[in-house]
Amino acid sequence: MVFAARLFLFVGFLIAPMLRSVDIAQAQIVAIGASNVAGRGVSSSDAWPAQLEGMLAAKGRNVHVTNAGISGDTNAGMLARLDSAVPQGTKIVLLDRRGGGWNARRRGMGDQNAELAAIEARLRGRGIRIIPMWWNAALRQYLQPDGIHFTVEGHRLVATNMLPAVMGAVR
């Protein structure tokens, strides 16, 4: 599992520069997902989307990252609210591919792969670039006592590891 995650990240970072970049003046970025996007258990300014926005600003990328995470959301829920959560003009979506599926599996709901495929197809159909939220087994040591949600440091690690892919997507 760790090997697969590392391989996914390695391949993603290799191809990121080859993918279409978005002009910074037109960049609107939306992070969508469940509680680890929303920042459950930490302040909104400590959630990874806000930290990522700050890191982008420090690198001279003055873009806004909208946090459209909802604690307890499922992939079906994300699909249902996709058009309102990701407004017209959005160029990049940072997609939590795990949290919503975890919530639904825990409740015995839906076909997670089909729902994720539908989310991605709808976003691509609108010309929106998708960057998956970074996950790694190393994050386990940065979870709150509930064993599910990131600590502030966990959020910082997610933002730090997503930064290169997002930097490659906005110029």
Where in this protein do the model-derived segments appear?
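Catalytic nucleophile-elbow at a beta strand-turn-alpha helix junction centered on a G-D-S/GDSL motif
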Residues: 28-42
